[in-house]
Amino acid sequence: MLKKIIFMGTPFFAVPILKSLYQNGYPISVVYTQPPQKSQRGQKINKSPVHGISETLNLEFRTPVSLKNNKDEYEYLKELNADIAIVVAYGQIIPKEILTLTKKGFINIHASLLPK
């Protein structure tokens, strides 16, 4: 049985998947999403849809600018010792060294073809 799940996602496309996991009792230990961005008009800071639903569901979330060469996030994920990670249109390439940090690997759900 899964005890710790990492969820990584950013757009609206990822929200129903995160909500379904949460509502069905899956143990989401942490959510990764893109950091808030300034909009073009008025320079208002906008959170990603996954960021917003994570706050609503009271889930721990992290918004690193990049995972590449990010020792803090690497150590955090290593210590978390998660069973699996579910990635839904996260918006970052996940470094190989991070892909090795879960017991059962990463599952990627993507709405379009991935870059080669």
Please describe what each predicted stretch is.
Residues 1-116:
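One-carbon transfer enzymes
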